[in-house]
């Protein structure tokens, strides 16, 4: 079992774990690694979100074995509850974000291990409460030079069969039955009756708009991967790969393009093994100019999409006695020159050296460095429906540009000592000790300006002023952590086993009064399928009885929240 820190025998592992092989990843491949894991393991759950649907740029809420933390009102309002139950993600021994996992080159992955319960995740201490996803990439293979290519097509088809919505006549009938066009005041009821007559006239003219299909399309994306690897018997091996992935969402105009490049070098000299992995990731995502799908679910079918001149209407109904603010047509904004784009660049270099003075003893040191730069551009011209109710005095406030830029840098260093030995054929002992230090520093700035009278000018510096009563904003964070982990595992005759793990975690997020916290687990088990009375039970491959107790934690909160 690959835990990301230690490697242990599955026969003596007391935790709940699923190991997914490269063959399974290829057989059940989805549009990204998250959807692939969902196709394979039923405990890996991606929560459905009907607001964002199949938006390729929206980070899904991922859970392993259900919810461990409940969101606050602020989490729901700011849409940050996604982070609360997200599992810890480890790539080749180093933590990565959910966004990075979403854009990984799945052709470079050799296996994925899901650590599900406390006994399995206690070695990660304050980060393991939500489960752990351990990803191992392919190592270069010795032999002749090999060049391989793999391409695929991904088709996203919207399915509206679950939506049973009323047509125009049925919707009007429902409103009439509910008494929407009656009022105790005669002048108000007269205005309501006029609106009712206008709607009936529209229905008689054949207006019956099925809004749900208007912003949707069948998205056809494609993925390409090229891999080169080789190396001789002199101890030097290498591999290089590039991948381009173009994902088109079912919402018109939404897409996500990613590029990944990787160079992996390996050199073995006697009892020393050196590895270096350099990876560059680029991503560009565009949101749909048609807005969110839930807007179209709320629109009345007796509203028409276009006017008599064939142009898309800006307002679906006139402002009057019934509407204090005229309902806007989300299709109108799609005719404008909008910008809603995010880009990021990640450069990661992981280096490790492994020394095996004896067959039973391994000492490994590794360090990972990662830098990320991200930008966000959002432009709405003056004709956008957001500004339709601005007065004449506010004409020079129409048009808006939001620009954000952020940078982050992190390092992660660990030193691991592992000892494994068999005694007298029936006794097997594993002892592991790990020391880990990590830091992540980030900062971001946001500028929000307004005043773009001309819709064809969408450059940030052409704005007339900052947003009213606004100013540039920014944020910064610094997270540090340190941890010492010990693990002892014993198995007798491949039948009876015990496992004990202890970790002392220190983190800047804990606050000054208590910087360190202990986490631990212990478990026992019995491999029933190894007993003699099970030898003739050919239809059963594995039957294990195990029990464990663990204490884990979660630090999914802001860097300075303990100071608040």
Predicted regions and their residues:
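Residues embedded in well-ordered regular secondary structure
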Residues: 10, 19, 23-30, 40-63, ...
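Extracellular/periplasmic, surface-exposed regions of secreted and cell-surface proteins
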Residues: 222, 258, 264-272, 277-282, ...
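Non-catalytic regulatory/gating segments with a bias toward low-complexity or hydrophobic composition
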Residues: 11, 37, 112-113, 133-135
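Periplasmic N-terminal soluble interaction domains immediately after the signal peptide in Gram-negative
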Residues: 1, 115-119, 124-130, 136-139
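Transmembrane beta-barrel wall of Gram-negative outer-membrane proteins
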Residues: 212-288, 295-307, 345-350
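Short amphipathic beta-strand segments in non-cytosolic proteins
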Residues: 1-8
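Short acidic/polar hinge/loop motifs at secondary-structure boundaries
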Residues: 35, 78-81, 86-87, 92-118
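Surface-exposed loop/turn segments flanking beta-strands in extracellular/periplasmic regions
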Residues: 169-206, 294-333, 378-399, 443-472, ...
């Amino acid at each position: 079992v690959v835990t990301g820190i230690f490697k242990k025998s599955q026969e003596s592992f007391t935790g709940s774990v699923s190991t997914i092989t490269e063959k399974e990843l290829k057989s059940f491949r989805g549009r990204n690694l998250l959807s692939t894991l969902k196709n394979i393991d039923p405990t890996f759950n991606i929560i459905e979100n009907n607001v964002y649907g199949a938006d390729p740029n929206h980070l899904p809420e991922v859970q392993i074995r259900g919810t461990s933390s409940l969101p606050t009102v602020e989490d729901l309002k700011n849409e940050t509850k996604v982070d609360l139950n997200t599992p810890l993600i480890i790539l080749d021994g180093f933590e990565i974000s959910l966004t990075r996992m979403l854009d990984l080159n799945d052709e470079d992955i050799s296996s994925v291990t899901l650590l599900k319960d406390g006994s399995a995740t206690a070695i990660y201490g304050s980060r393991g409460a939500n489960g752990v996803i351990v990803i191992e990439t392919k190592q270069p293979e010795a032999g002749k030079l090999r060049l391989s290519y793999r391409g695929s097509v991904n088709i996203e088809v919207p399915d509206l069969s679950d939506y049973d919505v009323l047509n125009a006549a049925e919707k009007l009938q429902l409103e009439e039955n509910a008494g929407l066009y009656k009022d105790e005041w005669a002048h108000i009821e007269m205005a309501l009756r006029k609106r009712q007559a206008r709607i009936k006239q529209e229905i008689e003219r054949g207006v019956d708009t099925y809004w749900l299909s208007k912003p949707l399309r069948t998205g056809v994306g494609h993925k390409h991967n090229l891999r080169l690897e080789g190396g001789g018997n002199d101890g030097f091996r290498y591999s290089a790969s590039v991948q381009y992935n173009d994902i088109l969402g079912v919402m018109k105009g939404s897409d996500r393009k990613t590029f990944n490049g990787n160079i992996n070098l390996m050199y073995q000299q006697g009892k020393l093994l050196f590895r270096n992995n350099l990876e560059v990731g680029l991503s560009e995502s565009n949101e749909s100019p048609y807005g969110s799908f839930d807007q179209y679910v709320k629109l009345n079918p007796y509203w028409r999409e276009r006017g008599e001149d064939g142009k898309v209407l800006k307002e679906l109904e006139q402002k009057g006695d019934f509407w204090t603010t005229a309902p806007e047509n989300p299709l109108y904004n799609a005719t404008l020159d909008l910008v809603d784009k995010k880009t990021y660049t990640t450069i990661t270099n992981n280096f490790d050296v492994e020394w095996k003075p004896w067959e039973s003893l391994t000492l490994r040191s590794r360090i990972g460095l990662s830098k990320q730069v991200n930008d966000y551009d959002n432009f709405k011209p003056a004709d956008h429906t957001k500004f339709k109710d601005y007065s004449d005095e506010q004409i020079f406030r129409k048009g808006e540009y939001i620009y954000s830029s952020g940078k982050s840098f992190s390092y992660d260093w660990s030193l691991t000592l592992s000892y494994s030995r068999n005694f007298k054929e029936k006794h097997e002992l594993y002892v592991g000790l790990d020391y880990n230090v990590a830091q992540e520093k980030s900062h971001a700035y946001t500028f929000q300006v307004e005043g773009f009278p001309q819709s064809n000018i969408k450059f940030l510096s052409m704005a007339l002023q900052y947003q009213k009563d606004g100013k540039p904003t920014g944020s910064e964070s610094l997270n540090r952590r340190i941890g010492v982990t010990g693990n002892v595992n014993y198995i007798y005759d491949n039948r009876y086993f015990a496992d004990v793990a202890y970790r002392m975690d220190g983190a800047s997020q804990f606050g000054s009064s208590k910087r360190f916290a202990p986490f631990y687990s212990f478990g026992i088990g019995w491999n029933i399928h190894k007993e003699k009375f099970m030898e003739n039970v050919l239809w059963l491959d594995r039957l294990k009885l195990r029990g464990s107790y663990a204490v884990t934690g979660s630090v999914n909160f802001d860097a300075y929240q303990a100071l608040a």
